[in-house]
């Protein structure tokens, strides 16, 4: 097999480090570039271990060549595969850059589809770039999807608030919310799991990736995260993708597709957990609010939702606001953007709406804190 080159954008984050682990166990995949934020020690370890020649990062390393942008990194390396694992709106920009230089995007940055799905798909088609999802749920649907479809189910864990009394949720601390029951993930996505904002984003991502109307995408809680996705076909067949929760498995598949080259834990029958529980509106109001704005068709509102959530979660993690304030900040910001009736016709419009939404969020936060 011919060697394939890989760049990881967001190499020192949760998905990034697991991607590094996967590449170390696969043959014929060469890591040729990374981007990272400020984690110098981990970045240096990766660069030295894989003899990476080029990187983009927030700090200088003692080895390798530092370039001043993700675009420059990708232009120099022109990788076969780019793993897009930068969270938030910065990840959207990185995905757009990757579409110019790579042959396949292993997409973990769900915000790319939430904020710019239409434009990402157009660029991918124009540049003949393959998009393979990394999220466990979308990887699951990707693997079992076929045209004669009635609807799909993606699952949620319910996060740290799943079994708590409703009156205890609003006052939760970051330490309590970051105790995810089944997955080991980064800070923002773990908080987004507790609010189920993450699952709202995944519904939008499924809508964009598989061209499915929202009414054909259902969400249920599977407490152990054993079931990742289900496809219901029109002839009555139900296809289920399941397995122990381990992000390295979908990461590996996004690299090796259509073949399977990665070896992992194989679950036994007595470990199967097929419980599917409804999502409670009172417990996860932001999830349902997100679905409402998505179904209304407004891309500006989706962008505003992401911008507000990104900032609100950071404030929560820094202990500047209570957990219960996240919902108020996001809904208020989206409603303010909604009043402006903004039409998003280009990527430039996407960036402008994000900038506007962040300004509005800061104003909403000021009112919440003072």
UniProtKB/Swiss-Prot annotation:
Residues holding Mn(2+): 135, 137, 202
Catalytic activities: 2-C-methyl-D-erythritol 4-phosphate + NADP(+) = 1-deoxy-D-xylulose 5-phosphate + NADPH + H(+)
Biological process according to GO: isopentenyl diphosphate biosynthetic process, methylerythritol 4-phosphate pathway involved in terpenoid biosynthetic process
Residue positions binding 1-deoxy-D-xylulose 5-phosphate: 110, 136-137, 157, 180, 193, 198-199, 202
Domain of life of the native organism: Bacteria
InterPro entries assigned: DXP_reductoisomerase, DXP_reductoisomerase_C, DXP_reductoisomerase_N, DXPR_C, DXPR_C_sf, NAD(P)-bd_dom_sf
Keyword Ribosomal protein tagged: no
Cofactor(s) the protein requires to work: Mg(2+); Mn(2+)
Similarity field: Belongs to the DXR family.
Function per UniProt: Catalyzes the NADPH-dependent rearrangement and reduction of 1-deoxy-D-xylulose-5-phosphate (DXP) to 2-C-methyl-D-erythritol 4-phosphate (MEP).
Official protein name in the record: 1-deoxy-D-xylulose 5-phosphate reductoisomerase
Native species: Fervidobacterium nodosum (strain ATCC 35602 / DSM 5306 / Rt17-B1)
């Amino acid at each position: 097999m011919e060697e394939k080159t890989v760049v990881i954008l967001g190499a020192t984050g949760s998905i990034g480090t697991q991607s590094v682990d996967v590449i170390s166990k696969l043959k014929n995949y060469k890591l040729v570039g990374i981007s990272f934020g400020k984690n110098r020690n981990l970045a240096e370890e990766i660069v030295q271990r894989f003899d990476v020649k080029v990187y983009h990062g927030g700090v200088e390393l003692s080895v390798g060549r530092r370039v001043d942008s993700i675009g420059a990194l990708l232009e120099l390396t022109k990788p076969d595969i780019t793993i897009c694992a930068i969270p938030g709106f910065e990840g959207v920009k990185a995905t757009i850059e990757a579409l110019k230089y790579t042959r396949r995007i292993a997409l973990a940055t769900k915000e790319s589809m939430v904020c710019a799905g239409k434009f990402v798909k157009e660029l991918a088609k124009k540049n003949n770039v393959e998009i393979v999802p990394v999220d466990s749920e979308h990887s699951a649907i990707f693997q079992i999807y076929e045209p004669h479809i009635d609807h799909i189910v993606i699952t949620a864990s319910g996060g740290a608030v799943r079994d708590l009394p409703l009156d205890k949720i609003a006052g939760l601390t970051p330490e309590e919310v970051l105790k995810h029951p089944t997955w080991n993930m980064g800070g923002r996505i773990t908080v987004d799991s507790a609010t189920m904002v993450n699952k709202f984003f995944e519904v939008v991502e499924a809508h964009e990736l598989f061209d499915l109307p929202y009414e054909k995408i259902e969400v249920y809680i599977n407490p152990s995260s054993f079931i990742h996705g289900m496809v219901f076909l029109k002839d009555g067949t139900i296809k289920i993708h399941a397995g122990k929760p381990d992000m390295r498995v979908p990461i590996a598949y996004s690299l090796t597709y259509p073949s399977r080259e990665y070896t992992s834990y194989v679950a036994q029958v007595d470990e199967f957990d097929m419980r599917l529980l409804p999502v409670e509106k009172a417990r996860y109001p932001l999830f349902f609010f997100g679905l409402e704005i998505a179904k209304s068709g407004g891309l500006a509102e989706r962008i505003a939702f992401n911008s507000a959530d990104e900032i609100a979660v950071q404030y929560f993690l820094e202990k500047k606001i209570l957990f219960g304030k996240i919902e108020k900040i996001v809904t208020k910001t989206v409603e303010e953007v909604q009043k402006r009736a903004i039409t998003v016709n280009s990527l430039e419009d996407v960036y402008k709406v994000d900038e506007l939404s962040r300004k509005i969020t800061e104003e909403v936060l000021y009112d919440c804190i003072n």
